[in-house]
Design a protein with these regions (language model features):
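Vicinal oxygen chelate
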Residues: 15-20, 24-91
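Short beta->alpha transition motifs characteristic of CBS
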Residues: 97-101
Length: 101
């Protein structure tokens, strides 16, 4: 992929009419840690709709993940009135949980 020393693993999740490609890069040993912010160019995250955001926050906290803030109320866009929260997985990938209004 143009990165000397990097290796990747690829998996596909398929359903009728849909295909999701999951790519995991294993960085070369000389790669330092990078912590991106939601406002940074190239930022990526995965989002999940949930029924009870407070229950999810409690569950991920119990599992050792730390939300980046308390759930916030969404005040613009298609999710206006809902609640959202970000956390990071052990690899630093940002995960968003969103509860619809």
């Amino acid at each position: 992929m143009g990165v000397p020393g990097a290796e990747i693993e690829v998996a596909y999740v398929q359903a009728p009419g849909h295909r999701l490609e999951l790519i995991q890069y294993h960085a070369p040993k000389d790669r330092g840690e990078v912590v991106s912010r939601p406002c940074d160019t190239g930022f990526a995250h995965v989002a999940f709709d949930v029924d009870d955001i407070d229950l999810v926050v409690a569950a991920v906290s119990k599992a050792g993940l730390r939300p980046l803030s308390k759930p916030v109320t969404v005040n613009a866009g298609p999710n206006t009135g809902g609640k959202a929260v970000y956390t990071r997985d052990p690899d630093g990938v940002t995960i968003e949980f969103i509860q619809k209004a």
